[in-house]
Amino acid sequence: SSSCTVYGQPDELPVTEKAPIKKAESPYGNTKQINEEIIRDTVASGAPINAIMLRYFNPIGAHPTALLGELPNGVPQNLIPYLTQTAIGIREKLSVFGDDYDTPDGSCIRDFINVVDLAKAHVIAIRRILEKKQKEKVEVFNIGTGRGVSVLELINGFEKATGVKLNYQIVGRRAGDIEKVWANPDFANKELGWKAVETLEDTCLLYTSPSPRD
């Protein structure tokens, strides 16, 4: 379980697996870079293992039953839980960190990947290792949709999908935030036979659905 944070702020978008690993912008990104180095070194040392590193972009969503999902204790650190807690009144307002980035609406751009699609990528990766189908001892795949969505676009999409008007405010930039990043998932599409299929609209709607999906 790696992360797109290993790329830092990519020079080219969408970012591919061949993009250089730049200095991490956050402690979290640094830990992912260190973890990747440890895995590569372990395999290179002759250990009898192979590895697949899945570089997640921004996971969101819940299982369709609504029985398994993201329900953090305390103040959420991720956008979607904070957004949903604001929608149902747990939080007074949502803070958008910065509207002066070099993006169409000034807010950060991310690649939001549904957690169910992400879980399916894990199953495929594990089977690839067990069935000895790897082409290299260490393989890396971007797990994203290939679609960049800004924070303000996500808020607007949530409001449209749910009919809930969100109370949000623009505040200053947050240290460690990447301006914009989204995946080129072509390698995972081709090699793993995997592709993100869940839409952002359906993902947002599930958060406030009164009953689980079948």
Predicted regions and their residues:
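Residue-level signal for the nucleotide or nucleotide-sugar donor/cofactor binding architecture
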Residues: 26, 74, 78, 110-116, ...
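Conserved C-terminal active-site "lid" loop/helix of NAD(P)H-dependent oxidoreductases
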Residues: 140, 171-195
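Conserved NAD(P)H cofactor-binding loop of Rossmann-fold oxidoreductase domains
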Residues: 2
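Mid/C-terminal beta-alpha module of Rossmann-like enzyme folds, strongest
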Residues: 83, 121-173
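Alpha-helical substrate-binding/gating segment
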Residues: 61-62, 84-102, 110-139
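Generic structural signal for residues in well-ordered beta-strands
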Residues: 51, 94, 166-168
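Conserved small/polar residues in nucleotide/adenosyl-binding loops
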Residues: 207-214
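Catalytic helix-loop patch of NAD(P)-dependent Rossmann-fold dehydrogenases
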Residues: 5-58, 67-78
